[in-house]
Design a protein with these regions (language model features):
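Core segments of cupin and vicinal oxygen chelate
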Residues: 1, 8-49, 103
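Eukaryotic phosphotyrosine signaling hubs
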Residues: 3-5, 68-73
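Helix N-cap motif at beta-to-alpha junctions
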Residues: 12-13, 78-81
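Vicinal oxygen chelate
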Residues: 30-32, 39-43, 74-75, 84-127
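Short histidine-centered beta-strand/loop micro-motifs
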Residues: 31-32, 63-66
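Short, charged/polar surface micro-motifs in flexible loops or helix N-caps
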Residues: 47-50, 60-61, 80-81
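Short, solvent-exposed aromatic-acidic interface loops
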Residues: 58-60, 127
Length: 127
C-alpha cells in the first residue's frame, strides 16, 4: 500500500497553485469534472512520491464542510528563515509561530497559512 495524495479545498485555484509552487511543488495535471462542477489540480514535489490535490468547486458560496477538522501540512526545509521569508513576502499569512526552536527536539519550526487558510508547518532539522 502506498499513500499517494491528500486533498484540500480551495476557493481560488490559481492563488493556491502559486502558493504551492513557492514551496517547490509543480503542477502535475488538472482534471475538469463537469458533472461535479469541480476542477482538481495535483501539485507534486520534486520527488513525485506524493501529491496535494487542490479541489475547487465552481460556484460554491458557503464554507466547505469538514474544513475545521484539518490540522496542517508539513514541509522539511533546508533553511527555515529563507523559506519563511519567501512565503510571507509572496503573500502567505503568518499564523501560529514565527521561526523558533522546538524545545528539546533539535529542530526549528514555523507556521504560515496558504490562500485558503490551511496551516503549513515548516521544519528545519538542526544537528
Amino acid at each position: 500500500m502506498k499513500f499517494v495524495h491528500s486533498a484540500t479545498r480551495t476557493r481560488d485555484l490559481d492563488a493556491a497553485i502559486r502558493f504551492y509552487k513557492m514551496l517547490g511543488m509543480r503542477l502535475d495535471h488538472k482534471s475538469e469534472l463537469t458533472k461535479n462542477k469541480a476542477t482538481l489540480a495535483f501539485m507534486v514535489p520534486p520527488e513525485e512520491n506524493f501529491a496535494i490535490e487542490l479541489v475547487y468547486n465552481w460556484g460554491k458560496d458557503s464554507p466547505y464542510e469538514g474544513g475545521e477538522r484539518f490540522g496542517h501540512f508539513a514541509w522539511l526545509v533546508d533553511d527555515l528563515d529563507v523559506t519563511y521569508r519567501r512565503l510571507v513576502e509572496g503573500g502567505a499569512q503568518e499564523v501560529g509561530r514565527t521561526p523558533a526552536p522546538l524545545q528539546g527536539e533539535g529542530q526549528r519550526i514555523a507556521f504560515v497559512a496558504d490562500p485558503d487558510g490551511n496551516w503549513i508547518e515548516l521544519i528545519e532539522h538542526r544537528d
